[in-house]
A protein has these predicted regions:
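Conserved N-terminal glycine/acidic-rich loop preference
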Residues: 28-31, 69-73, 221
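Active-site-adjacent beta-strand anchor residues
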Residues: 11, 33, 137-140, 187-188, ...
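A structured beta-alpha segment of the ubiquitous adenosine-cofactor-binding alpha/beta core
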Residues: 1-52
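Short, cationic motifs built from Arg/Lys/His that form the positively charged side of catalytic pockets
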Residues: 5, 36, 54-56, 100, ...
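Aromatic-enriched alpha-helical interface/lid elements that frame and gate functional surfaces
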Residues: 173-232
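Active-site-adjacent "lid/gating" segments in soluble enzymes
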Residues: 43-189, 193-196
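A generic secondary-structure signal for well-formed alpha-helical elements
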Residues: 28-29, 35, 39, 54, ...
Length: 232
């Protein structure tokens, strides 16, 4: 992700190199940092210092848990966030342990949210009051925001969704099926017209009028039976 970008390495414990960073800050639009909250202030690089050098500076602060709150002082890491957000609890198969994503998911979401926040802050600099802003980006909040519907359900019912593997809790069919040639097919047909087209495509038009599969709600209830038919 750093292709075609110029880079510089500075030892911020060295007073002379710290001054070089301040010189860069004075002529930059954005500064992005991901130290544990409070570390920048310890080095004499708090928001007040940075924006006194450049009042138009936008500062993006990326951390595990945010700049405020009971976990703010704790180190953050994507794996911790992917577990504590509830994502791992929902990911995987019902008869197995929770599953972490095979990529840096929390970091990626935080990067996207951070970029949007920085763009909005730059817009304010250019067309608003001309002052820089601080964008507080927490890995936890970025990933947790994608689970909003899960939080609403838990608040309303006191129950959490269970792991469903490749299936969805509220639509069917949705799964990955093994094919005769050893390859796999990802399939989702929750909309009624899509299911009817699927039934025709696999040569099973009678499924359309099968009482077990008349509606999406029916198909969710009988998803195991439907999965077996599709797998065969």
């Amino acid at each position: 992700y750093g292709r075609n970008k110029r880079s510089i390495v500075l030892n911020l414990k060295d007073p002379e190199e710290l001054e070089k960073l301040k010189a860069l800050v004075s002529q930059s639009d954005v500064l992005v940092e991901n130290f544990v909250p409070g570390k920048m202030e310890e080095m004499g690089l708090g928001v007040d210092v940075l924006q006194s050098l450049n009042p138009r500076l936008v500062i993006a602060r990326v951390s595990g848990w945010g700049q405020t709150g009971p976990y703010a002082h704790k180190p953050g890491f994507g794996t911790l966030v992917e577990a504590m957000s509830g994502f791992a609890h929902l990911n995987g198969f019902p008869d197995r342990e929770p599953a972490l994503p095979p990529l840096a998911m929390a970091d990626m979401y935080a990067g996207i949210y951070g970029a949007f926040g920085v763009l909005a802050a730059l817009r304010n600099v250019e067309h608003g009051d001309g002052k820089g802003q601080v964008v507080d980006v927490a890995l936890f909040e970025s990933l947790y925001s994608t689970l909003a519907s899960e939080a609403v359900k838990f608040q309303a019912t006191g129950t959490a969704n269970r792991r469903m593997g490749n299936q969805a809790i509220n639509t069917a069919p949705r799964n990955i099926y093994a094919c005769a040639d050893g390859k796999f097919l990802a399939l989702s047909a929750s909309v009624q017209s899509m299911f009817e087209n699927l039934a025709q495509a696999i040569g099973r038009p009678e499924l359309i009028d099968d009482r077990r599969f008349l509606t999406n709600e029916d198909r969710v209830i009988h998803c195991q039976e439907l999965n077996k038919i599709l797998a065969d």
